[in-house]
Amino acid sequence: MTTNNLIDIALHIPTPDAALTVAYSPIRLNLAGRQPLELRLTAPASGHKLPIVILSHGYGPSNYLPSKDGYAPLAQFWAERGFAVIQPTHASSRVGGLPAETEGAPFFWRERVEEVRAILDRLIEVEGQAPAVAGRLDHGSIAAVGHSLGGHTVSLLLGARLHGEVSGDSRISAGILLTAPGRGGKDLTDENEARFPFFDLDFAHLVTPSLVVCGADDNPRFTSRGPEWHADAYHDGPGARALLTLHGVGHGLGGIAGLDAKETEVEVPDGLEATKRMTLAWLRTILGYDAAAWTSACAALAGPASTLGQVEEKSSG
């Protein structure tokens, strides 16, 4: 939506006006030995050389939102402002994922990475199923964004490693980690260390330029640490250039998975709007479409919108 009477302070963060979009769903990619991978593609109705964002959903408590059909607040906002957003229904999805008896269930962390890689491999095929978008995407300008478990997926694609295993993909030029899991192993409770051995990522190889986003009121149940656990990729990953901490919001960052959703501990329209505007500004700058977007957004967050959050950045030197 473009008119929103519920936001106030976030209006200080500059952002482009919304433009008309088109959406295609379901786009299907046949994969060997399993059901097709289903996607949603939302893109500007006009323009060429559109940058691409692949948005990886979380695991979440809902049946439907952790799929290609969730995260409309983010996907629509970005598409209205120049990005082609591709959303897979991952193998872990309750509504459209792989059967529960399949190896790797229920989280399918390896399969999720391979699903994103399949999208990258077959972008021309994706475009071919979206006639109004075909030929308009910039295959050399791709960002990956992941929320929660999707942040784990994207961390691997950005270069993080699990026990030395290399999963990074150089076709991805930039990333955003939205309340992604932090360090695994002994940083987890005993129960969760046993349940989530794949959280034990080494972020030292995360070299792709990235933004890490955390909710100051997040309550990570996997660890005895506090919300700062979700910022580990920023502190450990050389490519993680900035840390955005949003005040007054938790794991759902004010409602990114869906409006009025149980994924959102507390619905905060200004917090959600700040998430949308700040992530858009990062994408526009890091992919080379507006050199001043991120600087201007950070200035607003440090000034008239300071109650909404803060940004920490590593020195360029």
Indicate where each model-derived feature is located.
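N-terminal cap/lid segment of alpha/beta-hydrolase-fold proteins
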Residues: 1-48
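Short beta-strand element of the alpha/beta-hydrolase
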Residues: 49-58
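Conserved alpha/beta-hydrolase "nucleophile elbow" surrounding the catalytic nucleophile
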Residues: 57, 146-152
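Short amphipathic alpha-helix adjacent to the substrate-entry channel of hydrolases
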Residues: 65-88
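Alpha/beta-hydrolase active-site loop
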Residues: 104-139
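Short glycine-enriched nucleophile-adjacent loop
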Residues: 124, 151-165
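The feature captures the conserved acid-bearing segment of alpha/beta-hydrolase catalytic domains
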Residues: 167-248
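Alpha/beta-hydrolase-fold serine-hydrolase catalytic core, especially in secreted/extracellular enzymes
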Residues: 248-250, 256-317
